[in-house]
Swiss-Prot record:
Xref: SUPFAM superfamilies: DNA clamp
A GO CC term attached to the entry: checkpoint clamp complex
Family annotation (InterPro entries): DNA_clamp_sf, Rad9, Rad9/Ddc1
Role, per record: Component of the Rad9-Rad1-Hus1 (9-1-1) checkpoint clamp complex.
Keyword vocabulary terms for this entry: Nucleus
Lineage: Eukaryota, Metazoa, Ecdysozoa, Arthropoda, Hexapoda
Record's protein name: Cell cycle checkpoint control protein Rad9
An individual GO BP term: cellular response to ionizing radiation
Organism of provenance: Drosophila melanogaster (Fruit fly)
Self-association state and partner proteins as the record states: Component of the 9-1-1 checkpoint clamp complex consisting of Rad9 isoform A, Rad1 and Hus1-like; the interaction with Hus1-like is direct. Does not interact directly with Rad1; this interaction is probably mediated by Hus1-like. This complex probably also forms with Rad9 isoform B, however 9-1-1 complex containing Rad9 isoform A localizes to the nuclear periphery. Interacts with Brca2.
Keyword Nucleus part of the UniProt annotation: yes
Pfam family, one: Rad9
Nucleus among keywords: yes
Motif Nuclear localization signal positions after renumbering to this chain: 300-302
């Protein structure tokens, strides 16, 4: 099989290879009795590009009757061959070695020839089952207009959104209500139907598609100086881009659009939707209220004047039932208290304490005595008169007998005892005697009270 083209048509094929290289990394070639088709599919299988060249473009189109051929080759190898085509005057394509290699011969100016061989990876082809002739919305415009629309957005943009209705079409780089970065710059461009060659939008639609493949086919349309046709239906349905030139070259780009279920909306936008839904629910509830209350109004008019007072509470009950059905919370709490909480006890008159005046005076006296004892314990204890204490520290292990004390000291000092509790008791008795003597002078109490306290 042999196919030859002149230089200008060979440069068109080179442009087609460059455009398809931006879609996928592999090229699928299909040759039949009518045309030669080149296809490419992206890695995510969301876009398929196809460019068809009719048989009339070739000078020699040697194809066996009732036969076809298809294969898959590397896109990188095609780009290396179809490069710098300005000097090419003639191009020849041949299938060699039992259709396992594709040979490309390029004859350039000054009688120079380039020859390259591209190996065939597999005899594989791709097809689509999408009906490309029944789309409700069709927009056709010059390639310059669509190129200007594309140039208004940054080259780093990945998606383009079109909002089309009967009055205008808006192209923007964002989705209304979707989550975006705070530093993201939003851009939109609004066009009138008069700026297009054909504007047929019968169904208001908002679609989002990938802009990378769209720009790749815009470059090929600029090379052909041809118009582009956009055909689409609704979000989630395929988006078609078609290019035709003199009935010899046909291009078709099929891209998937973003479904509304795959969009991550922001919380504010979701809140707006919820408020709108709440308003719709409330409006429906109001309609139901009016439909329920109408029979009551007619009954009131037919009855006597005393009936409205009896019917009015029924209407309020019905309204509260409707509102409670709409505003019914997920959780219901009871007004009962927890069983572990005890009620506060109220003291009765029997539980109250009544103090007698004499007992109150005695209690005050005891408290004053305790305070005085505490102060005396904090202050340094006075030494008894005419007494001398001498402390001896025995460093020897042997115990020596203690000297006997004189009888005169027994009345003035408290005898020492080896038992510590008796010593502490003696100190406390001495402190109490000192407190009593002080209370006699300060408080000037009666003699019978003081004598009773000494007896204690």
């Amino acid at each position: 099989m042999k196919y030859t083209l002149e230089g200008s048509n060979a440069r068109v094929i080179a442009k087609a290879v460059q455009s398809l290289s931006k879609v996928g990394k592999e090229m699928f070639i299909e040759i039949d009795q009518q045309s030669l088709q080149m296809r490419a599919i992206n890695a995510t299988q969301s876009a398929v590009g196809s460019i068809s060249f009719k048989r009339s473009m070739f000078e020699v189109y040697d194809m066996p009757p009732h036969s076809d051929f298809y294969c898959k080759i590397s896109m990188k190898g095609c780009l290396a061959v179809f490069r710098n085509m300005n000097e090419v005057e003639y191009c020849e394509l041949n299938l060699l070695d039992n259709q396992t290699n594709l040979q490309v011969n390029l004859r350039c100016k000054l009688e120079t020839t380039k020859e390259a061989t591209i190996s065939i990876i597999d005899d594989q082809n791709i097809n689509t089952n999408i009906n490309t002739d029944q789309m409700p919305n069709i927009i056709r415009g010059d390639h310059k207009l669509l190129t200007d629309i594309s140039n208004n957005f940054n080259s780093s943009e990945e998606e383009l959104t079109l909002e089309a209705n009967s009055g205008s079409v808006v192209a923007k780089n964002y989705i209304e209500g979707a989550r975006v970065n705070d530093k993201f710059m939003r851009t939109q461009l609004k066009l009138k139907p008069s700026e297009f060659e054909q504007y047929q939008v019968t169904k208001e639609t908002v679609i989002t598609f990938c802009i990378k493949e769209f720009r790749a086919f815009l470059l090929f349309a600029e090379c052909l100086n041809a118009s582009l046709t956009l055909e689409f239906d609704e979000a989630g349905m395929p988006f078609l881009l078609k290019i035709k030139k003199h009935g010899e070259i046909e291009c078709l780009l099929i891209m998937s659009t973003l479904s509304p279920d795959d969009i991550s909306f922001s919380e504010d936008y979701c809140q707006k939707d919820l408020t709108v839904q709440d308003e719709d629910v409330r409006a429906a509830a109001a309609k139901r209220k009016s439909s329920v209350s109408k029979p009551n109004v007619t009954n009131k008019r037919k009855g006597s004047s005393s009936e409205p007072a009896a019917v009015q509470p029924k209407r309020r009950v019905e309204e509260t039932q409707l509102e409670s059905s709409l505003d019914n919370p997920l959780f219901q709490f009871r007004d009962s208290e927890a069983p572990s909480v005890q009620h506060p006890r109220i003291l009765a008159e029997v539980d109250t304490v009544v103090l007698i005046e004499d007992e109150a005076e005695q209690e005050a006296l005891m408290l004053a005595a305790a305070d005085a004892a505490l102060e005396a314990s904090m202050a340094p204890a006075p030494e008894p008169p005419n007494s001398t204490e001498v402390c001896f520290i025995n460093t020897d292990d042997s115990q020596q007998p203690k000297p006997a004390k004189s009888s005169s000291d027994e009345d003035e000092t408290i005898p020492q005892s080896p038992e510590r509790p008796n010593k502490v008791l003696g100190v406390l008795l001495g402190l109490l005697q000192g407190c009593v003597s002080r209370l006699k002078t300060m408080l000037r109490l009666d003699e019978h009270l003081i004598s009773g306290y000494e007896l204690l």
